[in-house]
Amino acid sequence: MTRTPVGAAGAAPDEEPGAEAFGAWLLERLAAYLGRPIGPDTPFAEAGLDSVAALGLYGDIEEKYGPLIDPTDIQLYPTARELARFLALRTPRPLNRRSRVRAAFVFTGQGCQHPHLTSGLYLHSTGYRGHLEEAADALVPFLGGRSVVELILSGDPAVHQTAFTQPVLFAIGYALARMLEESGALPVAVAGHGVGEYAAAVVGGALPLHDAARLVALRGAFMQHLPAGGGMLATGATAERATEAAAGEPDVSVSAYNANRATVLSGGLPGLERVAGRLAADGVACRYLRVAHAFQSPLMEPVVPRFAAVARRVPGGSPRLPFYSTVTGAAADGPLDAAYWTRQITEPVRFADAVRHLVAEHRPTHLVEIGPRPVLLPFLRRLGGAEGPACLPVCRGPRTNAVDLAGVLSALEAGPFAGALAA
């Protein structure tokens, strides 16, 4: 994974409020580990900071300031000055209630589907209804003539079949985001979890609706026809512990890094059962996700050739909005083309990295979960910090209606009464 450090090396320590205090504290801790003082621009490796001491420094940071960073960030910001600036950027600041809302849209992925999803909002919001029908029309040619609107309103259990789940979630994400934009809530950045990246790419300006509809529908159809026997296991383990528990299981791998102690594994069901047993013996909570296959894992490889052939016929563009990739864990710095979407099928979801970078680099006041029900909210709250962005879902389940939507728009200072609220 390639991650780009925030800010240029050698930036002045007072460029970011709080960096100077972080720098002084870091130099004190580094002197304790190294047995001698070092300068703010001395590279840690050159000073002799080994991996054990670096892990100790990470522990000191977490104990004093909370989960601001990952252990690997100490390698990415390899001097006290650079690390201090990054810590200052990561530190949540109290919101100024008079400051303008800066919302980032985060699109939910597979696993949040349920019968009648967003049906209440469809019936009571003309804005949402219009955009959902627009997305449904774009998908119909690739779904054998079936409409995702019919699937939603009928409560059809086919919504749990991958060939329909992915297009339905794409349509919902697209419609919810367009409805918010139409009401005046414009995102400063976007990100998506797994298949949620397709709606994020459309809203971010990298893909037209019809091209994204083609890709996501065929992606789901190809995956639907894979042999049964795969699954996904959500765990309360750290990435390191989950990887350790999966050692010796060749068809089990980490498929999502959602937050600290929130790691998902994908693989064959027998292997997942053995891993779950090992984790349970250590008191680590585990639960199986309601999915039919081992998504975001090498077991998806059989899909790749067919999907790549389709994706090559769709010209992917560069996003116009900052797009935080959960493939790389950082802001996209090139086009979201066939190579990107093909890679996305088998790569793990680096959700935690993407959200941390989004928050550090864009300072949103709100993280808005775009999906039929909130499943990412706990991770967003942990990643944003206690005093960081407010986290809110657009939908809380199938009964979400126009009244609930009005509350969301009010929180985002959008909607028909935005001017009066801001006065």
Question: Can you name each region flagged by the protein language model?
Answer:
Residues T2-N96:
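Phosphopantetheine-dependent thiolation modules in NRPS/PKS and related acyl-activating systems
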Residues P37-I38, L76, G192, S253-N258, ...:
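Short beta-strand
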Residues A47, L76-A80, P94-A247, A285-A294, ...:
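FabD-like malonyl-/acyl-CoA
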Residues L233-A234, V284-I370, P374-P378, P398-L421:
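Acyltransferase
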Residues A239, G267-L272:
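Helix N-cap motif at beta-to-alpha junctions
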Residues A242-N260:
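Gly/Ser-centered flexible loop/linker motifs
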Residues A246-G248, L272-D282:
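Short amphipathic alpha-helices in soluble, non-transmembrane regions
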Residues R261-G267:
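A generic structural motif
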